[in-house]
């Protein structure tokens, strides 16, 4: 299942402005690769960021949102950001379901 992780931090805790956050950020890719193996996380599909919005958007393929929560805590994401984990669906999958439902009527 796909989940969107929306992690928003303040300008004061931004890795561009805060040395402690910068340290966490620079180690993040390696930490994610190591820590995700502990949980039912299949893959980090994409990792985007909006510097001006102070937000990271991480698309994760996982079984449970609780595993993503643990990942965010273990990697330090939750120590500098407010984290929101949202289940996602692909557009193509939803339109297929809609067509199947329509065809049954």
Spans of model-derived segments:
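Generic structural signal for short, flexible, solvent-exposed coil/loop and linker residues
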Residues: 36, 47-51, 57, 71-83
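Short hydrophobic/aromatic beta-strand micro-patches
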Residues: 8, 59-61
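An amphipathic, aromatic/His-enriched active-site/gating alpha helix that lines ligand/cofactor pockets
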Residues: 62-93
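Short S/T/G/P-rich N-terminal loop/turn motif that feeds into the first structured element of a domain
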Residues: 1-37, 41-54, 88, 92-105
């Amino acid at each position: 299942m796909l989940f969107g992780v929306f992690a928003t931090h303040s300008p004061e805790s931004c890795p561009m402005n805060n040395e402690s956050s910068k340290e966490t950020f620079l180690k993040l890719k390696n930490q994610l690769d190591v820590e995700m193996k502990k949980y039912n996380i299949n893959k980090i599909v994409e990792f985007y960021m909006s510097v001006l919005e102070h937000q990271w958007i991480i698309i994760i393929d996982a079984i449970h949102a609780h595993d993503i929560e643990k990942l965010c805590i273990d990697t330090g994401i939750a120590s500098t950001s407010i984290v929101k984990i949202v289940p996602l669906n692909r557009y193509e999958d939803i339109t297929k379901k809609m067509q199947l439902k329509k065809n049954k009527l």
